[in-house]
């Protein structure tokens, strides 16, 4: 294999290792819960990486982040395992 091919292979392996979460859960599960910046009261759930459990919180209806789920089952399937 040529040195260019080896460099390409090494680059692809590095990229794959960087983008593949170690635990198998999406990286957004590690985000802190964010209620957002509007004024609605939407019952939601977020994953707590320190306790490895899902908890309820109130979402404001806009903004926030991807660590937000409509049901505790969806949170558990996505982030707990």
UniProtKB/Swiss-Prot annotation:
Primary localization: secreted
UniProt tissue specificity: Expressed by the venom gland.
Annotated glycosylation sites: 76
UniProt-annotated site: Reactive bond for chymotrypsin, residues: 39-40
One GO term describing the cellular component: extracellular region
UniProt subcellular location: Secreted
Cysteines engaged in disulfide bonds, as pairs: 29-79, 38-62, 54-75
Pfam families registered for this protein in UniProt: Kunitz_BPTI
Domain spans labelled BPTI/Kunitz inhibitor: 29-79
Residues of the signal peptide: 1-24
UniProtKB keywords: Disulfide bond, G-protein coupled receptor impairing toxin, Glycoprotein, Protease inhibitor, Secreted, Serine protease inhibitor, Signal, Toxin
Family assignment from sequence similarity: Belongs to the venom Kunitz-type family.
Role description: Serine protease inhibitor that inhibits chymotrypsin (Ki=25 nM). Also interacts with vasopressin V2 receptor (V2R/AVPR2). Inhibits vasopressin binding human V2R in the nanomolar range (Ki=112 nM), and also moderately inhibits vasopressin-induced cAMP production (IC(50)=138 nM). In vivo, intraperitoneal injection of this protein into rats increases diuresis by 2.2-fold, without any loss of electrolytes.
Name assigned to this protein: Kunitz-type serine protease inhibitor NACI
């Amino acid at each position: 294999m040529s040195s260019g091919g080896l460099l390409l292979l090494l680059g692809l392996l590095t990229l794959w290792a960087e983008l593949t979460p170690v635990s198998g859960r999406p990286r957004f599960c590690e985000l802190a819960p964010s209620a957002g910046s509007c004024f609605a009261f939407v019952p939601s759930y977020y994953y707590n990486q320190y306790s490895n459990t899902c908890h309820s919180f109130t979402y404001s209806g806009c903004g926030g982040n991807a660590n937000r789920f409509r049901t505790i089952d969806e949170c558990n399937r996505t982030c707990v395992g």
